[in-house]
């Protein structure tokens, strides 16, 4: 099953990229308070970076990792997340629909889940996208 949401943020792609991708570890818990992240090293995020994660979203907390699998500045960030026994392939796509605005599409592929789970996962992704938009537009 795949889920994907798109939002348009009234800021240039450089600012959205910096907030979402470059400072992902610091900012992800701000838009998704059910997630705690910690980089395994102090190096900047790039392909191969491993991030430890803990999710308290559902009844049983799960520990796992995120590995950056693609990192094209101001265009694409892809991750492979090991969330307990599940592997999730996630992405964030960045485009510029007009000057000073950024279209951010976030999505994930959730193998083994059927489409009935969309009603649980999609609202969480929509909440995250709305919070990302609000945080970026209010801070920068």
Annotate each predicted stretch with a short phrase:
Residues 8, 38-83, 123, 127, ...:
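Glycine-rich portal/gate segments that line the openings of hydrophobic small-molecule binding cavities
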Residues 1-42:
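Hydrophobic ligand-binding cavity/cleft-lining segments
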Residues 2-4, 61-65, 86-91:
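Short, surface-exposed coil-to-beta transition loops
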